[in-house]
Amino acid sequence: MNDWSIDDARAGYNVTHWSQGFYGISDHGEVTVSPDPKNPDYKIGLNELAKDMVKAGVALPVLVRFPQILHHRVNSLCQAFDQAIQKYEYQADYLLVYPIKVNQQQTVVEEILASQASKEVPQLGLEAGSKPELMAVLAMAQKASSVIVCNGYKDNEYIRLALIGEKLGHKVYIVLEKLSELKMVLAESKRLGVTPRLGLRARLAFQGKGKWQASGGEKSKFGLSAAQILLVVEQLKQNDMLDSLQLLHFHLGSQIANIRDIRQGVSEAGRFYCELRALGASVNCFDVGGGLAVDYDGTRSQSNNSMNYGLTEYANNIVNVLTDICNEYEQPMPRIISESGRYLTAHHAVLITDVIGTEAYQPEDIQPPAEESPQLLHNMWHSWSELSGRADQRALIEIYHDSQSDLQEAHSLFALGQLSLAERAWAEQANLRVCHEVQGLLSAKNRYHRPIIDELNEKLADKFFVNFSLFQSLPDAWGIDQVFPVLPLSGLDKAPERRAVMLDITCDSDGIVDQYVDGQGIETTLPVPAWSADSPYLIGFFLVGAYQEILGDMHNLFGDTNSAVVRIEDNGVTNIESVLAGDTVADVLRYVNLDAVAFMRTYEELVNLHIAEDERAQILEELQVGLKGYTYLEDFS
């Protein structure tokens, strides 16, 4: 493909659309990051960055964070709502609340809070969904607006801690998820002498579409029905505490792809708000929860991995709908709160790692079968001969299907003992030659050929064995078929000669990335430059900043990866600010209650029993280094 250009690479991997301008491909074919929107010309080459870290002793895989992206996401979201409020003459403000469940890493939370340090009135709060998260936000919320939203199921201790937050100077909204929580709040607030700020989560009838749609709707795990909301209002009235009810919350799901779903959800919740106001409740905050999507595949569509709207449209729709409803009911306009954690964090982190080996099909010449060979092999040779003579287009699919059928029969005959191992191997090679030849002759412009092209791309794809654990670093790719953009970090100035699939290093057949962004769609294989051990390239997994770290598990005892925080200074200099070491072997053993110290004593006993004296020190040192070492592969050259 002599006419290949960088623009082809950018379009082929759809970088321009899913990256939101933070990532790109340079004219030299290397993937870059532009983390500081104030200085868009300042770019970092990810390939060189990774090599510099390796030289400094940071082993791959490494998760690289770009905090300036977090700053930009916070401020762009606040700006979008500020502009919408001005456009529709909305009579209240907007507050962005970060739900730390999305990424609880200290660096992430602190950078999000620091993003508005220069603002006289920060538009930023924190959300907790459990007691550990609440303990964290109680210590951090004063760095922003001191607003804390408490979601999730609660016991008496959770409620006491939330009320203590009020004593510490925070504005803590305790959102009722169940009717029984109200009784606990009333009792604990009386005991502590604290007037609570109450919220309630409404269980909407409307249910948005998407992977997380069970978060909404009448069968939702969370929230109060209309009847239960009326009971809350009545009990608060009886206790002369109706003015404590200050916040209405609802949640459609974590990734709402269709803007119409958002409008419909806000419309229904807006009616709840106005009805509560009419009943005498002092509700002044309208919490739309999460739902602001991330366009993982860059298609700007209604697919589960995308979104059919932009940030401005999102803010405009919420503000517009709520303005109209409040005007219709002649109710005051409430402060708008959103909990847009996925939007804030997804783009800021990239996992970079190396390929430890590849397995690729290379066409081999095949000789005709011996005359006494089973007729099946002669049939397969005939199919191959037809292709060698350049069969017409109509015959290609028939020849391909015949070859697949013959291969299945060959496997059956081998299992019955009617085909030797050598004959089976010949049949498999003949089938691969047919597949390879057919692949080169089919045309994507022919709609009848497209399904076969997809099959062959998958069948003949190279296998890249990549130094990472899918279950640790991309758990949503395994658990819910989430798509994450994957790119070689260099060599993109040349046309991709191969297609590949990425396999992790766990001992699990599920450890494979089976969906890839390819142009304006999703494919089961990834176009890649030709691989060479003499000039290898690194692989980047993008948009992994939301949920992946905390959801990741230790399958095969592969632990947390190394991580680094990287920033571009005002003078354009790249600064690796901090490096956090990943788990050692001893660390992950400790997680499952295995004692590395006791293991070392056992090793010493075994070494003294079985190893010659002149080798003992070397063997013990190797074992000790193994316990202190990285859980990922470091020595495979």
Curated annotation (Swiss-Prot):
Disulfide cross-links: none
Which residues are involved in binding substrate?
Answer: 286-296
Q: Which residues carry this modification: N6-(pyridoxal phosphate)lysine?
A: 101
Function comment: Catalyzes the biosynthesis of agmatine from arginine.
- The primary gene name is speA
Give the protein's cofactors.
Mg(2+); pyridoxal 5'-phosphate
Q: Which Pfam families has this protein been placed in?
A: Arg_decarb_HB, Arg_decarbox_C, Orn_Arg_deC_N
Q: What one GO molecular function would you report for this record?
A: arginine decarboxylase activity
GO BP terms: namely: arginine catabolic process; putrescine biosynthetic process from arginine; spermidine biosynthetic process
Organism classification: Bacteria, Pseudomonadati, Pseudomonadota, Gammaproteobacteria, Alteromonadales
Family, as annotated: Belongs to the Orn/Lys/Arg decarboxylase class-II family. SpeA subfamily.
Species of origin: Shewanella baltica (strain OS155 / ATCC BAA-1091)
Q: What class of enzyme is it?
A: lyase
CDD domains attached to this UniProt entry: PLPDE_III_ADC
Protein name (record): Biosynthetic arginine decarboxylase
Catalysed reactions listed for this entry: L-arginine + H(+) = agmatine + CO2
Q: Give the EC number(s) listed in the UniProt record.
A: 4.1.1.19
Q: Does the keyword Transferase apply?
A: no
